[in-house]
Amino acid sequence: MIRINQRKRNIEHTSDDFERKILKTLCIKKEELQGFQIRKQSIDARKKPVLYYVYSVDVQVRDEAKVKKTVKNNQIQFQIKPDSYHFEVKGTKELTHRPVIIGTGPAGLFCGYMLAAHGYQPILLERGADVDQRTKDVEAFWENGRLNLSSNVQFGEGGAGTFSDGKLNTLVKDKFGRNHEVLRIFAEHGAPESITYESKPHIGTDVLSAVVKEMRKYICAHGGEVRFHSQVTDIQTHSDNGQKILRKLKIYDSQKKETYLLDTDLAVFAIGHSARDTFSMLYQHGLPMQPKAFAVGVRIEHPQEMINQDQYGKNYPSFLPAAPYKLTANLDNGRGVYTFCMCPGGYVVNASSEEHRLAVNGMSYSRRDSQNANTAVIVTVSPDDFESDHPLAGVEFQRKLEEAAYLEGNGKVPVQLFGDFCENRPSVQLGRVTPHIKGMYQLANVRNIFPEFIAESLTEGIQIFDHKLPGYARCDAVISGVESRTSSPVRLIRDQSLQSEIRGIYPCGEGAGYAGGITSAAMDGIKTAEMIASVYHPFKMES
């Protein structure tokens, strides 16, 4: 197979134009072309308003050797092997009990998917509801403010990413093919095929919800089981020559209002970044963990049209997608300020999961067609900023900010104009930017939520961003808070076997501190499944 890299095409090109360009580049006739597939696609707007698509394309031809002799171009590679991923089952150790996966976010879901596909018959435990009921619970919360502690934006089938922009890009280095396998599985279960080649793939909360459901059906059809409303509240261990080994899980069924014990040889803790009670429980059992740096800040909203013109030029074609952006700044105080989880044509959402605490996030539907662009603007914080060196001190740091946000908005999302934020005064009216928020909101002084070093860093960072995207620091840009769940505040220590010191416990995904975002969490879930399959033979149910 031949790969053509860095091929620029006019933004309005047709598929026929595309094929003609391939034929010309490879100096072949149409009958010599057997097929082609887009490998990567991105938009080049560096010379706006002149815009291009930039492609990498994999091409099959009748006689590759002939083309190789004829064409001399350093952007063309020959004898490319197709992407392939291989899940190897080589474990010999017998499982006494079915493997258990705690959490059905991307890490848990993909771990369960791979184990089910290869005969391990996993049990997936999810404290929240299935995605259909969860959606109803979340929409009810946004409408009336009554929070369901186990079925909300953070907890339930699909994890926190279900109510997000559904971004699928990752910066994780991947020589094993896990990244492409994640995208392939998503596409196989209902996501658009374009996610496999777009430079910044996303599917939106509406499509992601449907894909998650189809993946669950696959798991169940291949011998797996998914138990909703099932929260792990405790573990039981036994000792073997001084080594703690997992023996049982204590599970609370919130629908039946009853507790039961589940025997298991191993449990994958893919619990997500908001499972603070589970972090605490594991700490009480002596599972090694450490605080880690993360970032906190606000959501900021601008008109999407302003962002489109900044990115594409004033007279951009209407068929282009809502434009994204990514901005960073290093401040004189040594801290970094950057945008995170930018949602073109999206919504700010009340993403709370604890009583009397309030957190926000960003979300987009697949069409990305709201009038506003929003992003988190966040400031790095490290364990040095926490009040103690306790492993869970970062959790308490988050909680204090969320409590302040709840009080500032009287239980609603506190909202402020950026100009008022700079002047440290509460907003009393909106400007030309109307908030697009899922959930009730109230004008307030968002600056009151933060320590001064965070507030000053946010102000300085946003003003720097204005030099990169004109209008970014406009006085009527709408900010809301608090963006506190950007990543896990703790890392659950695991060794090369991916287990903790309590053998049989596999910390996994974003909550455990080993991923950041949907795709990297899914990849870590696959990696954990691979490790289990390298030790254990597929589960055999006793007849």
Language-model-derived ranges and their functions:
Residues 1-53, 57-163, 167-543:
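Residues forming the flavin
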